[in-house]
Each structure stands twice: as structure tokens, then as C-alpha cells.
Amino acid sequence: MVSRAGLASLLGASFLLLLARSAEPLGFSHRPRTAGGELSAAPSRYLAREERWMSQRLDHFSSSDHRQFKQRYFEFLDYHDDPTGPVFLRICGESSCDGIPNDYLAVIAKKFGAAVVTPEHRYYGKSSPFDSLTTDNLRFLSSKQALFDLAVFRQYYQEKLNSRYNRSAGFDNPWFVFGVSYSGALSAWFRLKFPHLTCGSLASSGVVLAVYNFTDFDKQVGDSAGPECKAALQEITRLVDKQLLSDSHSVKALFGADSLKNDGDFLFLLADAAATTFQYGNPDALCSPLANAKKKGESLVETYAHFVKDYYIKKLGTTVSSYDQEYLKETTPDDSSSRLWWFQVCSEVAYFQVAPKNDSVRSAQIDTRYNLDLCKNVYGEGVYPDVFMTNLYYGGTSIAASKIVFTNGSQDPWRHASKQKSSEGMPSYIIKCSNCGHGTDLRGCPQLPFRIEGDSSNCTSPEAVNTVRKQIVKHIDLWLSQCHEPARAW
């Protein structure tokens, strides 16, 4: 999911999915090849980066609007030795899609001899239908339109394969879809809405539940931090809230964020910075300095300010401006991911990371009113997240589908918007370790910075990760084999 900083910071510097600003080893050892098929001297973080294009319909729900836009996608065929072998559709989410990541999906693809294809999400990166991102132009940005994009792309690429191998138009490779976070939700929803187009789905940290007041997010941040670190964060919040009343400019300048005039925007930045460490498996980066400062009697606020500037902003590439509502109002920003994702938040899924009434880590000023005011200020009247209708359409955590694997890291605040309990045909796994966060099954530990092939050796419990990975492969193997049966059991 995206953090305020925008998912571009994350997939670009990895993948920042915090809310509103806001896919491992099985014993396979190999040296990944480049997209051109040559063995590389050192593993790359991408399997493929060569851009390919297709024409996509702007509005799939209109019979009279025939406008189209160019959608970018990538393909990796090095492991696809059997033309009848599976195709893995890896879904890109709420950020620019600059290639196919060389994470644990690469290991799975090699095992199954799969082709890997990745289309970029409409509006993000280079797949935008419009030069100007006005609210009116954003009305075609939704998960529903994105799912039809995936269906059209799937059919387009299948026809492309059939033509390449001189096959009849009716031939169908077995397809399997993958996604992490919001794209994990899209993966599950694609299997729900288009079961005839895929043999199964992996929804890694798939946030399938639209949530209006997402208080469980902050509660999980506190739980993941542990008593000592949580208490330090709460003390920092109390002191910063107090300093904002007496000298807001000075305290914002301390964090390098004096450009943020809205106190809520500033407080959201501070909350995101803390949450990111647990979401992406780096708890010690935050909690160790705070514990040392507490022990030495040093300023917790100054220590946290150093962390925000050195880790969240400098190391992860977060920009302070992405938290500024005035920046979010820009219709032609240099990095549009934040404005785009916030529109999806404000119009469809909410995920409002508000402070719980009691024992909150984040400031109480980050409440429902703050989020609603942001939506109105940035996009105007009439943009409102109808989470009831979203959950009615997809089913939320009661999704009535089959052959979907749900996975979540135990420390990830986003897991409370995912399906955490298994049901018939939809196994769910919680990967338990102290640095198992967002997309651990595909990304390894920590989840940021990027780990080649989703290396799990730095997880506090590699076995916990690898056990779930074995289960994922087991389900993929079974469901792909059922796709090959004459009756093609869905």
C-alpha cells in the first residue's frame, strides 16, 4: 500500500505502502539470467526492464466511449522453455512500474518454467491516459477499471503467445496471478471476478478489506514496537504535540519539514516514518536509537528527528513535499503517485490510519476529520470513500472465491486489512518473526531495501518464511495441474 510518501519511493527505492500516502528458499539455487538470456556476472534487481506497449480502453464500462491509452508492460521468458507452460501475471500497483523485480517470484517462475509478465497500473508511471490529473480526469482511476485492464491484457498477451508459437486462437496457457499489498488485493479480486482467466492467485499482504477508520493499523504499530519502544514513541508524540502549540516552526524545522504548514500533514509524516520500520522489517533502525537515547537521558524528540531525516527521508528517498496537501493538489507533479493513490483512498478504499481513542502511538490530531478534510481540499466536493459499497462488491475478508493464497507478515500493520483466516479453497498464512512485514513471502527480510530473490537469511526466523513458501509452491503446483485437466476445474 502506499505511504504518504507515495509508492514511487518504494518501488523506486522499493515500495512505500503505508496508507493513504501510503509479492523464498525452497532449496532452489540458481543464478538468474538477464532478459536477453545471458548469464549475468551479478544478480540484478530486475528480471526485465525493456518496455513494451499495448492499447487499453479508457472506460471499460461505457459502450459509447472508445478512447484508448497506451499501457506499459514487461515480459520475461528466459524460464519459459515449454511453450505450453504457465504464465505468471505479476500485478503492478500504486506506483511507477519500472520492470519485473528479481524477488522470490523469480525462484518460483524458474521452478515452474513460467513466463512472467507485468502490466503497469493505469495512470501510474508511463501509463497515464491524461497529461493533467484533474479530479475530473481521475474518474477512470479505480480498482474496477484496473481489473478489466488486467483481463484485457491477459487476453492480449495470450493471443500474442499463440501467434508467436503458430498455435490456434483457442489455445490457453495456464495463468497464475501474483500481487503484493494493493496489487495483492487486485490479485485476489481478479481471481474472484475472472476465475476463467486464471488457475489461482497469490495475494501477498493483500489488503482486500476497505476500512474507514483503520485504528488497527496504529495498534499493530504499537504491538510490533514492543512496550519500551512504544512508550518512547508515545512520549515523542506527546512532546511534539505540545511543541506545535508553542513554536510549530522550530519543531518542524528540527525534522526538516518546516515547509509543511498544516500540522496534520506534519504529524502524518512522523507517524508514517515510525510505521514504515515495522511494515518493512527494520524495527531496530528505530527502536535501538530510541532505547539508547532513553538510557543516556538524551532528547527523544531530537533522536527521532535524526531518524526521520537520516533513515526515512535520506535512505528511503521519502520527500517531505509528498505530505503537503498543496503539493497533492498539483495536477502535473513530477511524481504523481501520491496524488493518484490518495484519489483511490479518498474515492474507494479509505484505509484512514486514524489514532485509536486510547493508547495511540500517533497523534490524536490524525483523525477522521483530518482525512476527510484532506480529500475535500485536494479533490473537491463529492469525492468520498464508500467503503460499504467497495466491500459489498468484493466481499472484504469474506471474499467468496477459490484458489487464492493469502500471506501476511506478523509485524505488518496492513495485515488487519487482509484475510488472516483460512477458508475453503483460500488458505491464509501468517509468517511469524520479529522482522516479518509487508510482502515477506516474496521480498524476504528486511522488506526494504530490496533483497535479490527475496533472500530470507536475514529474517529472524528464516524457517518461518521458507515453510510458508513451500506451502505457496504446493498450492501453485496443485492448481496448475488442475488447470491442465480436460475439464479444467476452476
Give residue spans per PLM region:
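C-terminal subdomain of alpha/beta-hydrolase-fold enzymes, centered on the catalytic histidine
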Residues: 265-490
